[in-house]
Amino acid sequence: MAAAAVVEFQRAQSLLSTDREASIDILHSIVKRDIQENDEEAVQVKEQSILELGSLLAKTGQAAELGGLLKYVRPFLNSISKAKAARLVRSLLDLFLDMEAATGQEVELCLECIEWAKSEKRTFLRQALEARLVSLYFDTKRYQEALHLGSQLLRELKKMDDKALLVEVQLLESKTYHALSNLPKARAALTSARTTANAIYCPPKLQATLDMQSGIIHAAEEKDWKTAYSYFYEAFEGYDSIDSPKAITSLKYMLLCKIMLNTPEDVQALVSGKLALRYAGRQTEALKCVAQASKNRSLADFEKALTDYRAELRDDPIISTHLAKLYDNLLEQNLIRVIEPFSRVQIEHISSLIKLSKADVERKLSQMILDKKFHGILDQGEGVLIIFDEPPVDKTYEAALETIQNMSKVVDSLYNKAKKLT
């Protein structure tokens, strides 16, 4: 019985590259077959077949079938050790949740698995599944639920010895706080995660996630793009080594850093590099267009890139936030360059030169006047911008302060001399 299953499993593996459907059918037949619990070889083959089938279903985008497999194998989990059962459930659930083809059943399936783990009194598995649920809540923007479950889980994990899972949950807490724009708490959670991670061996995926979040926090809070770039590069190498779909995201953030560092010419070199070449596509093309627009200081090209690659640029909150700031800086530079030769200029003329609507130009100019980027007023009645010369700086206060400081030094010197005489 076991020998036949081994032969079938080997045949399924040999068909992986040529005929995936046939391989899936063979693995299905092995998984559905009843086996004796005391037949160790048959149990091992069935376990390998379940993992291989799950991986194949994920690669072929069969999300519903993978969800069904996760429920179907539960009776079999009682015939293997708790550690193996936990690894099997986690692996299948990770495959299901990492798929691009969302079914809308992710949270429901995760909750079902948690309930099953509770009923079977599998504490470690339940905690691992709850960590995945926190991740799901974060992905679906249910931030308050993510924080509530995460804080409960952190209290439990700090009393136990599963440091890797503790790092995972601390990272999720940092991501959630960052999404809620609470940067001090996001940084504190990240620092806790890095401290915990220093004491253990981190698997490549966890280390890459840690580097990715470090890069995001450095970019968001400190605008330290050089440090952020090095973190994103480490994350990219980590994700690339395990063929994770998140590798492309870290590559996009690397390209974003180069644009924000005002070195858009490096973007082309990065994209055509050996490591990044396999990720060529719309995601990298989007950043290449933004880099070109930034290099040319062209608002029209920038807006075209944002329109043509809406999903790739606007749907990513990290990229969207920083590109909005880049666009703002680019607009200010363009406006200052346009108005520089004038002392009085029509707003319509400015809007025609930089190819933006009159209302947008008016709004931006009034903001720049309030921020003291230049001195002037908007005459909305006549639709003109009047620019004043830079007012001379009154140096009376500086001179007075300098005089007082010098007098203070003289008084101190006289006091010290008088002290020596007495």
Curated annotation (Swiss-Prot):
There is a cross-link at K274 (Glycyl lysine isopeptide (Lys-Gly) (interchain with G-Cter in SUMO2)). Transmembrane segments: none annotated. It is found in: Nucleus; Cytoplasm, Cytosol. The modification Phosphoserine is found at S14, S23. Phosphorylated by AMPK. GO terms for cellular component: cytosol; extracellular region; ficolin-1-rich granule lumen; membrane; nucleoplasm; nucleus; proteasome accessory complex; proteasome complex. GO terms for biological process: proteasome assembly; proteasome-mediated ubiquitin-dependent protein catabolic process; stem cell differentiation; ubiquitin-dependent protein catabolic process. Changing S272A: Does not affect phosphorylation by AMPK. Highly expressed in embryonic stem cells (ESCs). Expression decreases as ESCs differentiate. It comes from the Eukaryota. It holds the Pfam family PCI. Induction: By FOXO4; expression in embryonic stem cells (ESCs) is mediated by FOXO4. Residues 224-392 form the PCI domain. InterPro entries: 26S_Proteasome/COP9_Components, PCI_dom, Rpn6_C_helix, Rpn6_N, TPR-like_helical_dom_sf, WH_DNA-bd_sf. Keywords: Acetylation, Cytoplasm, Isopeptide bond, Nucleus, Phosphoprotein, Proteasome, Ubl conjugation. Its main location: nucleus. The modification N-acetylalanine is found at A2. One of its GO terms (molecular function) is structural molecule activity. Signal peptide: none annotated. Belongs to the proteasome subunit S9 family. PANTHER family: 26S PROTEASOME NON-ATPASE REGULATORY SUBUNIT 11/COP9 SIGNALOSOME COMPLEX SUBUNIT 2. Component of the 19S proteasome regulatory particle complex. The 26S proteasome consists of a 20S core particle (CP) and two 19S regulatory subunits (RP). The regulatory particle is made of a lid composed of 9 subunits including PSMD11, a base containing 6 ATPases and few additional components. Component of the 26S proteasome, a multiprotein complex involved in the ATP-dependent degradation of ubiquitinated proteins. This complex plays a key role in the maintenance of protein homeostasis by removing misfolded or damaged proteins, which could impair cellular functions, and by removing proteins whose functions are no longer required. Therefore, the proteasome participates in numerous cellular processes, including cell cycle progression, apoptosis, or DNA damage repair. In the complex, PSMD11 is required for proteasome assembly. This is 26S proteasome non-ATPase regulatory subunit 11. It comes from Homo sapiens (Human). The gene is PSMD11.
